[in-house]
Amino acid sequence: MTLTKAELADLLFEKVGLNKREAKDMVEAFFEEIRNALEVGDGVKLSGFGNFQLRDKPQRPGRNPKTGQEIPITARRVVTFHASQKLKSDVELAFDGTAA
């Protein structure tokens, strides 16, 4: 199962008591703030959860899988996520080895 933004809003509605519109707006605002920080080059640290960081990847050689022709893969900036040790250990404790 995948948790969606709509499901997060429903959980805020159920557990926190916000109305559905406020819950949806709060989820949207949360992700908008993360997006804004990353767009200006800032990292995002969520204590007990993890860090979103930007990483510059240099240009590198690639290959067209159809033709085999060598083509350059341009330099780019990517977003990376590193889970906190707490999140990793919580997930490990919850995992009982029966997941499909």
Swiss-Prot record:
A GO cellular-component term linked to this record: cytosol
Entries under Pfam families matching the protein: Bac_DNA_binding
Membrane spanning stretches: none
GO biological process assignments: DNA recombination; positive regulation of metabolic process; regulation of DNA-templated transcription; regulation of translation
CDD domains for the chain: IHF_A
InterPro entries from the UniProt entry: Hist_DNA-bd, Histone-like_DNA-bd_CS, IHF-like_DNA-bd_dom_sf, IHF_alpha
NCBIfam families membership: himA, PRK00285.1
Family classification: Belongs to the bacterial histone-like protein family.
Function: This protein is one of the two subunits of integration host factor, a specific DNA-binding protein that functions in genetic recombination as well as in transcriptional and translational control.
UniProt-recorded name of the protein: Integration host factor subunit alpha 2
Organism: Dechloromonas aromatica (strain RCB)
Gene name linked to the record: ihfA2
